[in-house]
């Protein structure tokens, strides 16, 4: 279980760093409004990642399968963005997907580092 918590902390840290870099880049190259929309989506992605981690943590002890209620978070955010004129759907959605970019970075890093003990396990 300790490895799970370390992985979770690493993924959250990478997500937050990536969010900061992309937020500043979007603010510089586009506008503050679009950057804030991205940040809203990225924060929702971090909350989604946290909910997923709690769900996985309970898996096996209390539950037999993962719940689908986490997707309601994204649906509510997209619905809010479509109703409120100040919010834009695309930057919010791309911000939400930041945690997916974190997962891709982690997998590529683990796959190409041959000294990783995770790769030596059968």
From Swiss-Prot:
Transmembrane segments: 11-31, 32-52, 88-108
Topology within the bilayer: Multi-pass membrane protein
One Pfam family cited in the UniProt record for this chain: CGL160_C
Lineage top rank: taxon: Bacteria
Subcellular location: Cell membrane
Keywords (A to Z) from UniProt: Cell membrane, CF(0), Hydrogen ion transport, Ion transport, Membrane, Transmembrane, Transmembrane helix, Transport
A GO cellular component annotation in the UniProt record: plasma membrane
Chief location: membrane
One BP annotation, GO: proton transmembrane transport
Role according to the record: A possible function for this protein is to guide the assembly of the membrane sector of the ATPase enzyme complex.
Recorded family membership: Belongs to the bacterial AtpI family.
Name listed for the protein in its UniProt record: ATP synthase protein I
Organism the protein comes from: Nostoc sp. (strain PCC 7120 / SAG 25.82 / UTEX 2576)
